């Protein structure tokens, strides 16, 4: 499989999300698959949940054990930084650390599978998001 191509040997342990997610949020697994959509299209969203060290309301999905106070301060500053050039530089700096530390292995990109039938029409959107307003009933 894909993971073997990068030297990672795994034994699949498929679980319902009600059993899988607590393993991540409670830090009880060393390796896991997690899909993460970014509705804001902003790196801050990813950093808040997946990179920032665990606190009561931030870093809640960081199952890596990674914790860096200096980086956490930069992540928090993104929410109020209005200097676009400085904010973009902070985002680039944070991504550099994330990549250098190899916090995540982006080996799998899951997309929606589209089912079609003659009775229902829908445009397949390039953003991979079905928009109900474009549904037609034939």
What role is predicted for each listed range?
Residues 1-5, 22, 26, 69-76, ...:
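Solvent-exposed, polar/charged alpha-helical surfaces in well-ordered, non-transmembrane soluble domains
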Residues 2-55, 90-91:
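Periplasmic binding protein-like
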Residues 12, 16, 35, 39, ...:
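Extracytoplasmic/periplasmic, Sec-exported soluble proteins
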Residues 17, 54, 87, 96, ...:
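Arginine residue identity/basic-tract feature
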Residues 23-28, 48-80, 109-138:
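Short, solvent-exposed loop/beta-turn-alpha elements that line the ligand-binding surface or hinge
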Residues 28, 32-36, 81-118:
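Bilobed periplasmic-binding protein-like "clamshell/Venus-flytrap" ligand-binding domains
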């Amino acid at each position: 499989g894909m993971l073997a191509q990068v030297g990672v040997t795994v034994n699949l342990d498929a679980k319902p999300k009600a059993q899988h997610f607590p393993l991540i949020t409670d830090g009880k697994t060393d390796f896991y698959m997690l899909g993460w959509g970014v509705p804001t299209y902003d790196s801050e969203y990813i950093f808040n949940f997946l990179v920032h060290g665990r606190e009561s309301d931030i870093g809640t999905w960081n199952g890596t054990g990674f914790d860096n106070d200096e980086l956490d301060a930069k992540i928090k500053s993104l929410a109020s930084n209005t200097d676009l050039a400085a904010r973009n530089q902070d985002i680039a700096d944070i991504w550099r650390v994330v990549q250098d530390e190899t916090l995540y292995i982006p080996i799998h990109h899951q997309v929606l599978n589209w089912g079609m039938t003659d009775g229902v029409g829908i445009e397949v959107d390039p953003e991979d998001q079905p928009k109900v307003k474009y549904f037609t009933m034939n």
